[in-house]
């Protein structure tokens, strides 16, 4: 499948392109408050680098939160606009579920994502499955 993946839930602003289920390019910038300015350019450049049209995509995956409210709105708006324009399925991807995929631990544990100041988003997991 040809999938465009968009990340905007945190300070990371980025996108990845998967062609035939293989990651062919990833472009991300770890800098706060640049999503509105940079994310459309990142997506444009990814597609341009691989001579792709939006209509050639079979799905658009986008981080669905929790995370930065403004970042999520920007990422979701871009993804939804592209999906609607190309009549392509939109695939929401929960942020905590993705972070949990990198953990191989049994028992109960928490996945945390910095929110702002001294606040975090958290979700409890039990042996890899959501527990809250």
Describe the predicted segments one by one.
Residues 22, 34, 89-132:
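Surface "functional belts" at beta-alpha junctions
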Residues 48-55, 84-93:
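Phosphate-handling active-site elements
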Residues 1-64:
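N-terminal beta-alpha supersecondary unit
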Residues 38-41, 77, 98:
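Short amphipathic alpha-helical face segments that pack within enzyme cores
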Residues 31, 35-38, 70-74, 92:
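Generic, well-ordered alpha-helical segments
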Residues 59-90:
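DPxDG-like acidic metal-binding loop motif
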Residues 12, 68, 117-119:
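Glycine-rich nucleotide phosphate-binding loop and flanking beta-alpha elements
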């Amino acid at each position: 499948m040809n999938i465009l993946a968009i990340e905007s839930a945190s300070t990371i602003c980025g996108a990845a392109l998967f062609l035939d289920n293989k990651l062919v390019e990833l472009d991300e910038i770890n800098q706060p408050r640049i999503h509105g300015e940079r994310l459309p350019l990142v997506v444009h450049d990814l597609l341009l680098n691989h001579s792709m049209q939006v209509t050639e995509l079979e799905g658009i995956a986008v981080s669905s939160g929790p995370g930065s409210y403004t970042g999520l709105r920007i990422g979701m708006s871009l993804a939804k606009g592209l999906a609607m324009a190309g009549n392509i399925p939109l695939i929401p991807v929960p942020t905590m579920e993705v972070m949990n995929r990198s953990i191989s631990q049994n028992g109960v544990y928490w996945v945390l994502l910095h929110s702002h100041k001294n606040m975090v988003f958290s979700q409890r997991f039990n042996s890899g499955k959501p527990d809250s």
